[in-house]
Swiss-Prot record:
The keyword Amino-acid biosynthesis does not apply. This is Large ribosomal subunit protein uL16. InterPro entries: Ribosomal_uL16, Ribosomal_uL16_bact-type, Ribosomal_uL16_CS, Ribosomal_uL16_dom, Ribosomal_uL16_sf. PROSITE patterns: RIBOSOMAL_L16_1, RIBOSOMAL_L16_2. Belongs to the universal ribosomal protein uL16 family. Binds 23S rRNA and is also seen to make contacts with the A and possibly P site tRNAs. One of its GO terms (biological process) is translation. Transmembrane segments: none annotated. Keywords: Ribonucleoprotein, Ribosomal protein, RNA-binding, rRNA-binding, tRNA-binding. Gene3D superfamilies: Ribosomal protein L10e/L16.
């Protein structure tokens, strides 16, 4: 699963997900892409499950680019712990995804194959997504 090799700080604040994605909202590598249509935190496990679903479907043909990377640590407190005594320890990593952000790209396969692979990947994700091609890569 994906996670940063090292970070400047162990813990982060939660933050807010307002507005549309300003960067990462155009197709740069492949011919087809999966675009988020709502904001969400996507865990490294969900990204890995989506990647596996796509690679299993397209088998040997084509290339997949994962444009989303989980760089935000999410902390959790131990079970049945009283309030106070600081923030919990980092448990897993998430990627902050805003509407319009392109998460996966595919090239080297026909459109029906890419569409089905993206559909299988989208089922593993907790948000609504949109399949786009290089011609119409807008929100």
């Amino acid at each position: 699963m994906l996670s940063p090799k090292r970070t400047k700080f162990r813990k982060q604040q939660r933050g807010r997900m307002r507005g549309l994605a300003t960067g990462g909202n155009t197709i740069n590598f492949g011919d087809f892409a999966l675009q988020a249509t709502e904001p969400c935190w996507i865990t490294s496990r969900q990204i890995e499950a989506a990647r596996r679903a796509m690679t299993r479907y397209i088998r040997r043909g084509g290339k997949i680019w994962i444009r989303v990377f989980p760089d935000k640590p999410v902390t959790q407190r131990a079970a049945e712990t009283r309030m106070g005594s600081g923030k919990g320890s980092p448990e897993f990593w998430v990627a902050v995804v805003k509407p319009g952000f392109i998460m996966f790209e595919i090239a080297g396969v026909a459109e029906p194959v890419a569409r089905e692979a993206m559909r299988l990947a989208a089922q593993k994700l907790p948000i609504k997504t949109k399949f786009i091609t290089r011609e119409e890569d807008f929100v």
